[in-house]
């Protein structure tokens, strides 16, 4: 196989939305014999998840620029210069065959270092709106891959790109079809609530309030993932309102969680939307209102357009509105219809397309 023995350096960090798609590609490449390295920040989300996956992790001193004010931007040239120097030394040591940037601030210095060293650079954009790092790297990358055509808006026309969709973990792609999963299901509607790796305040605090407004017999069976920092406060809110739910900080087995659910309430990060489409589930999305260029709303549009999902704006969302939305989703057969429509937006071939693009760059 072309990837056997090849050294691949992945760059992705900051949030699960960047790290998990990159891990899906890294695992698939490792199965084909590649040696996987990862460039990131030890204190970031990737610093924990990548070593857990068994891959070699290389730390560089870099942080995001957005939200750090004037001082952060003034320090940026020095921080980036140092990070590029660190990334360059790491690449000279490990000599990767291909460098793969999948978003997050660590990708920027790494991409620049790859260009300086003339190492093939591939970038992949998961969101419907291209992020700052990938928009800059698109001018020097050998290969540009996009999850959707919408993301091409920030790429100058002279830079060719391919639309591949988003890579999703294999265990999710292997889930039975919605009809098979729903066939013998009865009892209370099963609701999966996803607060994301960073936690979503609006979802975590409004959801228990909304459920408390419903009669006991209309309340779904809830599995609520809060993110670590919102766990205790969310548990307190449920207890104070005398609403029962299974509340967890993280879900390790997302395939199982999707398989057991009838529908989902979630933010609309690119990875979440892709996983829901691939699994086949009805969804109610509450996009993060401060996402750059409102990309989370755009991420959710495909599922909304095919009738698999609804989108509610956080700024106008109340417990009453959310309670009404939950109350209107009591018909499992209607949820099954939406679940089947969701699969029209799935990216089942994305992983193979990305691996093919990596192989093309291997010398």
Curated annotation (Swiss-Prot):
Organism name: Dichelobacter nodosus (strain VCS1703A)
Q: Which gene encodes it?
A: murG
Topological relation to the membrane, as annotated: Peripheral membrane protein
Pathway(s) this gene product operates in, as recorded in its UniProt entry: Cell wall biogenesis; peptidoglycan biosynthesis
Q: What is its EC number?
A: 2.4.1.227
Task: Enumerate the CDD domains for this protein.
Answer: GT28_MurG
Where along this sequence does the record place binding of UDP-N-acetyl-alpha-D-glucosamine?
A: 15-17, 127, 169, 197, 251, 270-275, 296
Q: Which reaction does it catalyse?
A: di-trans,octa-cis-undecaprenyl diphospho-N-acetyl-alpha-D-muramoyl-L-alanyl-D-glutamyl-meso-2,6-diaminopimeloyl-D-alanyl-D-alanine + UDP-N-acetyl-alpha-D-glucosamine = di-trans,octa-cis-undecaprenyl diphospho-[N-acetyl-alpha-D-glucosaminyl-(1->4)]-N-acetyl-alpha-D-muramoyl-L-alanyl-D-glutamyl-meso-2,6-diaminopimeloyl-D-alanyl-D-alanine + UDP + H(+)
Q: What does this protein do?
A: Cell wall formation. Catalyzes the transfer of a GlcNAc subunit on undecaprenyl-pyrophosphoryl-MurNAc-pentapeptide (lipid intermediate I) to form undecaprenyl-pyrophosphoryl-MurNAc-(pentapeptide)GlcNAc (lipid intermediate II).
Report the locations given in the UniProt record: Cell inner membrane
Q: Give the protein name, as stated in the record.
A: UDP-N-acetylglucosamine--N-acetylmuramyl-(pentapeptide) pyrophosphoryl-undecaprenol N-acetylglucosamine transferase
Record keyword Ribosomal protein present? no
The residues that cross the membrane are none
């Amino acid at each position: 196989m072309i990837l056997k023995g090849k050294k691949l350096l992945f760059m992705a960090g900051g949030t699960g939305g960047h790290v998990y798609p990159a891990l899906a590609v890294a695992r698939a490449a490792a199965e084909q014999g590649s040696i996987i390295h990862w460039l990131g920040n030890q204190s970031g989300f990737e610093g924990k998840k990548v070593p857990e996956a068994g891959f070699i992790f290389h730390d560089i001193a870099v942080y995001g620029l957005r939200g750090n004010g004037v001082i952060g931007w003034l320090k940026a040239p020095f921080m980036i210069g140092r990070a590029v120097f660190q990334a360059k030394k790491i690449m000279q040591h490990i000599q990767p065959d291909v460098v793969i940037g999948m978003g997050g601030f660590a990708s920027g210095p790494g991409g620049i270092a790859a260009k300086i060293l003339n190492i093939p650079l591939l970038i992949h954009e998961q969101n419907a709106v291209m992020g700052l790092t990938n928009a800059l790297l698109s001018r020097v990358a050998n290969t540009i891959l996009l999850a959707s055509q919408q993301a091409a808006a920030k790429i100058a026309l002279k830079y060719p790109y391919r639309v591949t969709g988003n890579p999703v973990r294999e265990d999710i792609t292997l889930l039975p079809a919605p009809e098979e999963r729903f066939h013998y299901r009865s009892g209370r509607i099963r609701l999966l609530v996803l607060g994301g790796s960073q936690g979503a305040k609006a979802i975590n605090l409004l959801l228990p309030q909304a459920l408390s407004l419903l009669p006991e017999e209309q309340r779904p069976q809830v599995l609520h993932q809060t993110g670590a920092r919102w766990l205790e406060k969310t548990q307190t809110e449920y207890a104070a309102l005398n609403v029962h739910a299974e509340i967890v900080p993280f879900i390790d087995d997302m395939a199982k969680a999707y398989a057991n659910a009838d529908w989902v309430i979630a933010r609309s990060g690119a990875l979440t939307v892709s996983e829901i489409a691939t699994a086949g589930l009805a969804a109610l999305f509450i996009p993060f209102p401060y996402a750059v260029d409102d990309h989370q709303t755009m991420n959710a549009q495909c599922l909304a357009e095919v009738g698999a999902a609804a989108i509610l704006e956080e700024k106008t969302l109340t417990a009453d509105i959310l309670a009404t939305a939950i109350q209107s989703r009591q018909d499992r057969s209607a949820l099954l219809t939406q679940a089947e429509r969701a699969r029209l937006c799935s990216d089942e071939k994305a992983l193979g397309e990305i691996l093919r693009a990596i192989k093309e760059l291997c010398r």
